[in-house]
């Protein structure tokens, strides 16, 4: 008993000693708060990079982009500039800013990517912000958003190809934004290079002074070191005041599994730090900032983003819903809403090409939905609507800016999410003007009015037209005019901007343009033509819905609104192609292409034949006729009640190009 009491006394004294030690020794208390990161606000710049950036005033900021036609060397030039400023190590062509698999495979830029650079010019540090923009017409929304965060642009032209259609289009976009343009002639090291011709084209087409142009080779690095001093001297510094309330523009967004939605922002006024609470003008939702930083070239955390800078932020707790990140939205700090005027934002791009997407396996629909939602977060110009088909099940109707945009989205869906999908051929919207004066835009061919409704209730049908600008060598002029005329085009203008190069303008139906017009144009000109287009309004048109019928039952997944001149050709093509992919049945299958009740093409698949005469004697004619009649009646009954089973792979093969 005595031993037990001694043990208790020893334990009691030990506890008292530990309590006195705890009270006398003050350990720092670590506060965990999921909403705010208070410690980040008071953090001083520690890295050499942060110290250098903190010492640079807004007068020594430069935000610029590179404007060019597809494949004129934008991404390669970006690499050389990043190497020159020490942002990345010198080496082979890395295409640092082309981060998507599809960009590296196709050699094109799809997403506008950004990077900050530090450059010492005449003993002073400058903070340069470079945007690598897409060149293709389909990604014009990306281009126009990029221009909003820039003060100037390098207008890049290939010395061997000269000015192309998208050079012209992107020049006018940049000019409309008021950007200061620096002419640059690239690929001067090629044997086929003709810099003098390219300079003359710039002078005649854009009225730019050839003396201000810089002749470079992005591949070899020739004269690239002259570009950044030219940018510093000619491109104006961004305007902003870091002492004013925060005014922050959302330029782009992408999704991270761990951080939620990450925003690319341009700071116009004020500054933002981790721990600040900001509010969206578009949604009214409030968020605590988890981290701010710059792209250098990857995400590099910073203490603060100041007026004039472009960088990224993400929130803590994270922004989980991609729909909350509205591109063109303005953010400010909570409490400053009445002091800040929201920025005008961006014009929403209109989808002009529509496809339907279905999973090959119906059970994959939730996975497909999740995959599409993640991709649309990074690409705001895609419109999304659920739809259902009797033949293919549940799916989505997707709207795109153009055919390349559609093709790239499909590639990204397959590569980045492994989704096995069926994509229908691209279609365009049509306008229905009813007799009561109402107007309706129809994007789904299945919802296009039937022939009886058209005659009774519809006053007029219209289809969209575009003004296409085509540039190509003069020797192919006859072939290109013939191609445009066969696609219902109307010539608007023809000019020679050099002795060998032609600019041809045609008004074309958008439906013809999405039907592989660019591929046919490349074929007619041996790949030397370039194409750009802009909307040209709606026109009255003789259009109708072409349907595919199997045993007189319409297949809803295969219907298309076409011009009267295309009905016969497309109808015959459909029935012959669909016949190849449908398996024989025990009864005859009739495949028809029809406009309303008018059948324009027909094919039939003969049934399997059982030899009912096998056991008969050759001379038993009466019995022979009786068995054949019986077999014929049986087939009629089977055809009347039997359903044609068409597998998904048949649709997949039929809808593939």
Swiss-Prot record:
It is found in: Mitochondrion inner membrane. Its EC number is 3.6.5.-. Keywords: GTP-binding, Hydrolase, Membrane, Mitochondrion, Mitochondrion inner membrane, Nucleotide-binding, Protein biosynthesis, Transit peptide. Residues 59-239 form the tr-type G domain. Belongs to the TRAFAC class translation factor GTPase superfamily. Classic translation factor GTPase family. LepA subfamily. HAMAP family: LepA (MF_00071). This is Translation factor GUF1, mitochondrial. The gene is GUF1.
């Amino acid at each position: 008993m005595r031993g037990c009491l001694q043990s208790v006394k020893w334990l009691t004294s030990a506890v008292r000693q530990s309590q006195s030690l705890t009270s006398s020794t003050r350990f720092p208390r670590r506060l965990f708060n999921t909403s705010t990161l208070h410690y980040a606000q008071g953090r001083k710049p520690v890295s050499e990079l942060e110290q250098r950036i903190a010492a640079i005033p807004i007068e020594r900021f430069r935000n610029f982009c590179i404007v060019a036609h597809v494949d004129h060397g934008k991404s390669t030039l970006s690499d050389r500039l990043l190497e020159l400023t020490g942002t990345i190590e010198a080496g082979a062509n890395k295409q640092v800013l082309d981060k998507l698999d599809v960009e590296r495979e196709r050699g094109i830029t799809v997403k506008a990517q950004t990077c900050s650079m530090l450059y010492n010019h005449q003993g002073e540090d400058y903070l340069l912000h470079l945007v690598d923009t897409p060149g293709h017409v389909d990604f014009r929304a990306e281009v126009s958003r990029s221009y909003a965060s820039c003060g100037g642009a390098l207008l890049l032209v290939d010395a061997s190809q000269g000015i192309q259609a998208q050079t012209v289009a992107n020049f006018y976009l940049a000019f409309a934004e008021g950007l200061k343009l620096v002419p640059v002639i690239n690929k001067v090291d090629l044997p086929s290079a003709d810099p003098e011709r390219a300079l003359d084209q710039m002078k005649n087409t854009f009225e730019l002074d050839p003396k201000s142009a810089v002749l470079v080779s992005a591949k070899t690095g020739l004269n690239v070191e002259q570009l950044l001093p030219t940018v510093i001297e000619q491109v104006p510094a961004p305007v902003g005041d870091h002492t004013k309330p925060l005014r922050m523009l959302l330029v782009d967004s992408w999704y991270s599994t761990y951080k939620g939605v990450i925003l690319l922002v341009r700071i116009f006024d004020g500054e933002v730090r981790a721990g600040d609470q900001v509010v969206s003008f578009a949604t009214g939702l409030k968020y605590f900032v988890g981290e701010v930083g710059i792209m250098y070239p990857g995400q590099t955390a910073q203490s603060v983003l100041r007026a004039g800078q472009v960088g990224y932020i993400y929130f803590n707790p994270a922004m989980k819903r991609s729909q909350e990140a509205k591109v063109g939205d303005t953010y400010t700090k909570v409490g400053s809403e009445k002091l800040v005027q929201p920025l005008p934002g961006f014009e929403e791009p209109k989808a002009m090409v529509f496809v339907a997407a279905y999973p090959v396996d119906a059970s994959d629909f939730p996975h497909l939905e999740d995959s599409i939602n993640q991709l649309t977060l990074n690409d705001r110009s895609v419109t999304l609507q659920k739809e259902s088909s009797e033949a293919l099940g549940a799916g989505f109707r997707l709207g795109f800016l153009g055919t390349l945009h559609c093709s790239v989205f499909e590639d990204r869906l397959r590569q980045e999410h492994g989704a096995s999908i069926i994509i229908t051929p691209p279609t365009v919207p049509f306008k229905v003007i009813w007799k009561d004066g109402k107007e309706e835009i129809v994007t789904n061919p299945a919802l296009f009015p039937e022939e009886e409704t058209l005659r009774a209730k519809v006053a007029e049908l219209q289809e969209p037209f575009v003004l296409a600008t085509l540039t190509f060598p003069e020797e192919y002029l006859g072939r290109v005019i013939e191609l445009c005329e066969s696609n219902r085009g109307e010539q608007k203008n023809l000019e020679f901007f050099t002795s060998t190069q032609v600019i041809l303008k045609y008004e074309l139906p958008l439906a013809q343009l999405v039907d592989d017009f660019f591929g046919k144009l490349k074929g007619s000109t041996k790949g030397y033509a370039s194409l750009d287009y802009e909307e040209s309004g709606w026109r009255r048109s003789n259009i109708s819905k072409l349907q595919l019928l199997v045993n007189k039952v319409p297949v809803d997944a295969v219907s298309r609104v076409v011009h009267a001149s295309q009905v016969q050709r497309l109808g015959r093509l459909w029935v012959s192609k669909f016949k190849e992919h449908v398996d024989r049945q025990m009864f005859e299958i009739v495949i028809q292409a029809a406009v309303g009740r008018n059948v324009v093409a027909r094919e039939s698949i003969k049934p399997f034949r059982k030899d009912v005469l096998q056991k008969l004697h050759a001379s038993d004619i009466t019995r022979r006729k009786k068995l054949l009649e019986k077999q014929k009646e049986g087939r009629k009954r089977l055809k009347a009640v039997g359903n044609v089973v068409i597998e998904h792979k048949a649709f997949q093969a039929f809808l593939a190009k």
